[in-house]
UniProtKB/Swiss-Prot annotation:
Superkingdom classification of source: Bacteria
Keyword entries, A-Z: Cell outer membrane, Membrane, Plasmid, Signal, Transmembrane, Transmembrane beta strand
Main location as per UniProt: membrane
Entry's family note: Belongs to the OmpW/AlkL family.
UniProt function note: Could be involved in the transport of substrates.
Subcellular location, record wording: Cell outer membrane
Gene3D superfamilies: 2.40.160.20
Protein name as annotated: Outer membrane protein AlkL
UniProt keyword Membrane present: yes
Oxidoreductase recorded as keyword: no
PANTHER family: OUTER MEMBRANE PROTEIN W, PTHR36920
Cleaved signal peptide residues: 1-27
């Protein structure tokens, strides 16, 4: 992922921290809340607005049996809705399942294949099962981390310059860092970042010529939303 992409990612993180800080000030002054905390047997459901930032790296592009040098693609970022639900097996440890409305990836030819324009499009999204560790609260703030495994699924594959476009579903590791703020009455403000790096196979045809390659994708999912403890 390029440095410019990391600068783009940093902005939503700063915005999320600002929102959490503003919520803290408002709630402390206007809405006294008892600490929600977590207990064994609790469920926490979260609904989020999420921004997907993608870094990508194309492997050797095989065209008709030969490698085409200096070929690359860009995918682009997208905004979507996500949902996850966690079950607390203890006051600090939870099992979390995460899904979302699929994001749209638009593969654009770059460098030696830039003249192809839009290569293909596909909807995609991970289904992630994670084990989370929730730290003890700091005032009303509840930080947490998670690690797990996700299945990256691809839907609605659309041809562009590349015909018979296909991209394979893949398993991938998943990492998460998050922070919740207790608003009271079982409601919490949620902010988290997930990272799901994976490499997958892409095939298709360019006219009558078969094309194949591998693409490494490094998506960050930045989310901001509400959580409910029950």
């Amino acid at each position: 992922m390029s440095f410019s992409n990391y600068k783009v990612i940093a902005m939503p993180v700063l915005v999320a921290n600002f929102v959490l800080g503003a919520a803290t000030a408002w709630a402390n002054e206007n809405y006294p809340a008892k600490s929600a905390g977590y207990n064994q047997g609790d469920w926490v459901a979260s609904f989020n607005f999420s921004k997907v930032y993608v870094g990508e790296e194309l492997g050797d592009l095989n065209v008709g049996g030969g490698a085409l040098p200096n070929a690359d693609v860009s995918i682009g970022n997208d905004t979507t809705l996500t949902f996850d639900i966690a079950y607390f097996v203890s006051s600090n440890i939870a099992v979390d399942f995460f899904v979302g409305v699929p994001a749209r990836a638009k593969f654009q030819g770059e460098k030696s294949i830039s003249s192809l324009g839009r290569v293909s499009e596909v909807d995609y999204g991970p289904a992630i099962l994670s084990l989370q560790y929730h730290y003890d609260s700091f005032e009303r703030l509840y930080p947490y981390v998670g690690v797990g495994v996700g299945r990256v699924l691809f839907f609605d594959k659309t041809d562009g310059a590349l015909s018979s476009f296909d991209i394979k579903d893949k398993w991938a590791p998943a990492f998460q860092v998050g922070l919740r703020y207790d608003l009271g009455n079982s409601w919490m403000l949620n902010s988290d970042v997930r990272y799901i790096p994976f490499k997958t196979d892409v095939t298709g045809t360019l006219g009558p010529v078969p094309v194949s390659t591998k693409i490494e994708v490094d998506p960050f999912i930045l989310s901001l939303g509400a959580s409910y403890v029950f």
